[in-house]
């Protein structure tokens, strides 16, 4: 086949897409809109932000988390000491949130190990699974079935009921 062919005999097939005609009588309105947005919105916002960042760079303020001292447990409060009971309640709520975070962290570690190990996760993640089961059991022993209106008093009553049930089970086991 020769390098050049006779274009009169074998014309080129027509293109499927029409050739763009860059010559139009009207300018593109999108160009004007983007320039107007840049001038009216983007540049002033950028200038204000850069100014604020420079001011913040001059005056650095360091944020630290708040540390609460431990307060007495609700069992150590006097009967009419409302302030002590309130502090004990707030301490219990902080402990509750900390325990929730501990369970979440251990669960994330277990999930990461299972993801990393794939099919052999039962064998290779046994330590993480054992730790997770211990943490979840301790969490459920303390906080399970408290309901939506949980409090330190309800938790203490639940703990008392659990201790009484354990004593009763121990007596029955000793008698049998």
UniProtKB/Swiss-Prot annotation:
GO terms for cellular component: mitochondrial inner membrane; mitochondrion; respiratory chain complex I. The modification Phosphoserine is found at residue 151. Keywords: Electron transport, Membrane, Mitochondrion, Mitochondrion inner membrane, Phosphoprotein, Respiratory chain, Transport. Residues 1-15 have a biased composition (Basic and acidic residues). Residues 1-27 are annotated as: Disordered. It is found in: Mitochondrion inner membrane. It holds the Pfam family NDUFB10. Its main location: mitochondrion. Belongs to the complex I NDUFB10 subunit family. Complex I is composed of 45 different subunits. Interacts with CHCHD4. This is NADH dehydrogenase [ubiquinone] 1 beta subcomplex subunit 10. The lineage of its organism: Eukaryota, Metazoa, Chordata, Craniata, Vertebrata.
């Amino acid at each position: 086949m020769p390098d050049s062919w006779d274009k009169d005999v074998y014309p080129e097939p027509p293109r499927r897409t029409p050739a763009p005609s860059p010559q139009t009588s009207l300018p593109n309105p999108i160009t004007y809109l983007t320039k107007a947005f840049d001038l009216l919105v983007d540049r002033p916002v950028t200038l204000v932000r850069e100014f604020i960042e420079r001011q913040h760079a001059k005056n650095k303020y360091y944020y630290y988390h708040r540390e609460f001292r431990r307060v007495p447990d609700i069992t150590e409060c006097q009967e009419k000491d409302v302030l002590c009971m309130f502090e004990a309640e707030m301490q219990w709520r902080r402990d509750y949130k900390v325990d929730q975070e501990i369970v979440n962290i251990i669960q994330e570690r277990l999930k990461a190990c299972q993801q990393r190990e794939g099919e052999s996760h039962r064998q290779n993640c046994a330590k993480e699974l054992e730790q997770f089961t211990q943490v979840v059991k301790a969490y459920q022993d303390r906080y399970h079935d408290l309901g939506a209106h949980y409090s330190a008093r309800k938790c203490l009553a639940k703990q008392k009921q659990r201790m009484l049930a354990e004593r009763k089970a121990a007596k029955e086991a000793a008698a049998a």
